[in-house]
Swiss-Prot record:
Summary of subunit composition and partner proteins: Component of the biogenesis of lysosome-related organelles complex-1 (BLOC-1) composed of at least BLI1, BLS1, CNL1, KXD1, SNN1 and VAB2.
UniProt record similarity statement: Belongs to the BLOC1S1 family.
The keyword Transit peptide is annotated on this UniProt entry: no
Residues with PTM Phosphoserine: S33
GO CC, any one term: endosome
Record keyword Transport present: yes
Role summary: Component of the biogenesis of lysosome-related organelles complex-1 (BLOC-1), a complex involved in endosomal cargo sorting.
Subcellular locations according to the entry: Endosome
Name of the protein this chain belongs to: Biogenesis of lysosome-related organelles complex 1 subunit BLS1
Organism expressing this protein natively: Saccharomyces cerevisiae (strain YJM789)
Length: 122
């Protein structure tokens, strides 16, 4: 009968409950064996892949994300800033115009109220 690694681990867990230290020792012995086992080969491949992912792929992904963010957000805002900066000085004039219109509306409302009051009193 051929036993796989997972079958061995399951057997160890079932036969030796509450012996996590011994299980850790056996797993460490299997994985760090000086003889090239499938488990040690797989572990080595995982470590190599992790190094490649962190050192190469993650940097490329960050660069791609930075470029995408810059093209979608920063560049349009800079364009709008350059386009509308000349109009920024006009906001003070607009504020003054709005204040004058507001004042005129209040005067008209007061005049209307006075006219209405005079009509009702006659």
């Amino acid at each position: 009968m051929f036993l796989t690694f997972s079958m061995c681990v399951n057997w160890i867990i079932v036969k030796m409950p509450n012996r996590s230290e011994e299980l850790d020792r056996l797993l460490d012995k299997i994985i760090n064996s000086p003889h090239r086992t499938e488990a040690s080969k797989t572990l080595q491949e995982i470590e190599n892949n992790q190094s490649y992912i962190l050192n190469v792929q993650l940097k490329k992904l960050l660069r791609l994300h930075d470029d995408s963010f810059k093209n979608k957000c920063v560049s349009p805002i800079n364009y709008m800033l350059e386009k509308y900066t000349p109009y920024m000085g006009h906001t003070e004039a607009l504020q003054k115009e709005a204040e004058l219109v507001d004042r005129d509306l209040r005067i008209i409302e007061m005049t209307y109220q006075l006219i209405k009051k005079n009509r009702n009193s006659k």
